[in-house]
């Protein structure tokens, strides 16, 4: 293998590894009023260009666990593509229903 081919391969592998690197997600709980918190998943790339707030339709009760998994909504288009938004340099916030609305009917009839 010539030196130029080797260099091209190295550059290609670096580009591939950068493209496959995912922005880690973090679960954040924000106190909103007495005894109530607002949980969200935040994906923050190193230098975000802008921010997007993603909210699932329907009843809105994602039931985000501390590890970032969801009991409902993983199939929702915005929830599925949150990493792609972050990959484009956007800070992403996926918002759950507030802690006092974590059972049926969640946000139905509330918002």
Model-derived regions, located:
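A fold-wide structural signal in alpha/beta-hydrolase
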Residues: 51, 86-96
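Alpha/beta-hydrolase active-site loop
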Residues: 76-77, 81, 87, 99-111
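Solvent-exposed loop/turn segments at secondary-structure junctions
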Residues: 58-61, 98-102
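Sec/Tat-exported extracytoplasmic proteins
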Residues: 34, 56-59, 89
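N-terminal cap/lid segment of alpha/beta-hydrolase-fold proteins
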Residues: 22-47
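Short, surface-exposed "cap/lid" segments of acyl-processing enzymes
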Residues: 45-84
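Sec-dependent signal peptide recognition
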Residues: 2-12
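N-terminal signal peptide c-region/cleavage motif recognized by signal peptidases
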Residues: 16-19
């Amino acid at each position: 293998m010539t030196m130029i081919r080797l260099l091209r391969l190295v550059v290609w592998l670096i580009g591939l590894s950068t493209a496959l690197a995912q922005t880690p997600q973090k679960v954040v709980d924000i106190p909103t009023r007495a005894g109530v918190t607002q949980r969200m998943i935040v994906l923050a790339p190193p230098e975000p260009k802008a921010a997007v707030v993603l909210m699932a339709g329907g009843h809105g009760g994602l039931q985000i666990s501390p590890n970032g998994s969801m009991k409902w909504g993983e199939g929702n288009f915005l929830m599925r593509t949150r990493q792609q938004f972050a990959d484009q340099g956007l800070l992403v916030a996926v918002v759950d229903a507030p802690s006092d609305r974590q059972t049926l009917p969640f946000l139905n009839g509330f918002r």
